[in-house]
Design a protein with these regions (language model features):
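Active-site-proximal cofactor/substrate-binding loop regions of enzyme domains
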Residues: 1-8
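Short, surface-exposed beta-edge/turn micro-motifs
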Residues: 5, 41-42, 77
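Intrinsically disordered, low-complexity segments enriched in glycine/proline and serine/threonine
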Residues: 5, 15, 100-103
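Histidine-centered nuclease catalytic patch
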Residues: 9-57, 63
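Long, low-complexity, intrinsically disordered segments enriched in glycines and aromatic residues
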Residues: 55-98, 104-111
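C-terminal, charged low-complexity interaction regions
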Residues: 96-166
């Protein structure tokens, strides 16, 4: 995708919900100042503290810690599984080492903060309701479609991953 996506990389919080996005560093600036302006080291991150009070997650929670699973890895999503309760978990099909990497990434970024769990749970419930109405294949195929701006729907990967489509 060219340019910055219209949503935060890990949290998938869209601009439309009123949260400002900021640049996050995959390798923290404090660990490698040479990567500060390296585009290959940047991703979009939400500004959490203004909207969730003290519930910091994603870039604000990361601080100077390294991420074991980079959001820029081609297979990044394969490290995670989304439970029907909205929680993000390590993919049980991975090796023990890979599960530990996923678990550490979830912990570092606080990807199971209340606001993210609530949002994921909501999209899963909406998807289940649509599946009952339209059928599983129709709904999941629609999630792969981009909007007029070229972006996927917020949290699109949650039901796709939950229903094992990606």
């Amino acid at each position: 995708m060219e340019g910055a996506p219209p949503y935060a990389t890990y949290g998938e919080i869209p601009r439309e919900v009123g949260r400002a996005l900021r640049n996050a560093h995959i390798t923290p600036q404090s660990r490698d100042e040479g990567k500060t302006l390296d585009y290959a080291n940047l991703c979009a991150s939400c500004n959490t503290s203004k909207h969730t009070r003290n519930e910091k997650h994603c870039d604000e929670a990361q601080g100077s810690r390294e991420l074991p699973v980079s959001p820029l890895q081609e297979d990044c999503i394969s490290y995670f599984f989304f439970g029907s309760d909205g929680e993000i978990l390590p993919n049980p099909k991975l090796t023990e080492e890979e599960q530990e990497m996923a678990s550490a990434t979830i912990s570092i970024l606080r990807l199971n903060s209340n606001s993210l769990i609530t949002a994921r749970k909501q999209i899963l419930q909406e998807t289940v309701n649509l599946i009952k109405e339209l059928g599983k294949l129709t709904v999941l195929d629609r999630l792969f479609q981009r909007n007029a701006q070229g972006a996927f729907a917020p949290y699109y990967f949650v039901p796709l991953r939950h229903f094992q489509r990606i």
